[in-house]
Amino acid sequence: MSRGKRYNGSEHKLNIKKVIAVIIAFLVIIMFVAVFIKLMQPKAETTEKKVAMAYYSAFTNNKWGIIDSSGNTVITPSYDEMVVVPNKDKAVFIVTYDVDYTNGTYKTKAVNEKNEQLFSTYDQVEAIQNYDQQNNIWYEKSCLRVKKDNKYGLIDLSGKVLLDCNYESIEPLIGISNSLITTKDGKKGLVSSTGSVIIDNEYADIKSLTNEYENGYIVK
């Protein structure tokens, strides 16, 4: 009579260990695949809200300086004359100094947010001021008037030359933005604030038809 195989307890425990090991290995594989899939998925773009910085003239203790839109002092008030901000979005400021009220003379220069001089190759750098019928004052935002060897030209706020210093004067067409009257050899002409010639220097006088430059000009 044959006898049945006797139960081997150690072999049973070994089989259980193998099953557990297989399960653990399977779970590790699943975790690895899940991590891999997550890494392969495109990351959601995070958008940061950026607040545009703006600059303004500031008057404190009878001195002029510059502050930013957060109220921080950019240039400590130290100037007797107002520091002009042609374009509030650009850190280019015009300061007036060595003013002689008796003789009506003064000097101007451009500085940056560190109060360092810009465009120093020119004898004078000015913002171009204009006004309307209600005496509201504004400045051309995209250009500056520069002087060299007693002649005037235009640059943009990065220093790029828009018009060479070949003109006896460059003045705004009063009440009209983006329109500047140039004088060369005693004749009037018209350019835009980007330096584009609109009317050649061939006339005694130039006036606007309306308060919108698109509506045309009268030349004499």
What are these regions (language model features)?
Residues 2-220:
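Residue-level detector of conserved, function-critical positions
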